[in-house]
Amino acid sequence: MPHEHKHDIFCAGRAGKLIGFLRRLTQNPYRILKPYLKEGMTLLDFGSGPGFFTVPAAKLVGTSGKIYAVDVQQQMLDMLVKYADKKGVLGNIITINNPEHEIGIELEADIILAIYVAHEVPDRDKLFLSLKKRLKPEGFLLLAEPKHRVTETEFKETLEIAKKNGLEEAGKFKMVESRTAVLKKS
């Protein structure tokens, strides 16, 4: 019997925790993203929050690349814009506020990030179908969920939903205190 799916949204008022020094130390975004991102690529950061992965991704893809940052909370995107501007990478980041947990734009991405967000989305079938539609045939979706919020059983259920919607597991990536999977189109 499936577990009840939690979908509480992380409060923007606590966003400092999402980009703080301790998280950068334990979940270094450059170390996580570098094996997947090259200059000129397009990345979709679904549930970008204040830009913990978005800003490093923008540096890795360079000025010839494009980053789409999608979040349900405009306050998170406002923080992301300030952070990206401070780091000098705002020029290749497009922010999209969509309170309906949708992407809201047609695009094709080399890499899609869904980091600490799937458990917040009420309709994960719709989520994975939408993400698959925007993933290039040779692209990868990096999925991570926090161990303190998502049990191993719940994460396996999430992977089954992804599989049902045309994505298969192609591996894992290392991220402290997280359950992870690298997904590709099946």
Where are these regions (language model features)?
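Class I SAM-dependent methyltransferase SAM/SAH-binding core
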Residues: L44, P50-E102
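Conserved beta-strand signature within the Rossmann-like core of class I S-adenosyl-L-methionine
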Residues: E138-E145
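Class I SAM-dependent methyltransferase Rossmann-like catalytic core
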Residues: H7-T26
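A short glycine-rich, Lys/Arg-flanked "PGG" loop and its adjoining helix->strand segment in the class I
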Residues: D125-P137
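A short SAM/SAH-binding and catalytic strip from SAM-dependent methyltransferases
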Residues: D110-D123
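Conserved alpha-helix/loop element of class I SAM-dependent methyltransferases that forms part
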Residues: R23-M41
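A short acidic, Gly/Pro-enriched loop at the edge of an enzyme's catalytic core
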Residues: K38, H101-I112
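Core SAM-dependent methyltransferase catalytic element
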Residues: N165, K174-S186
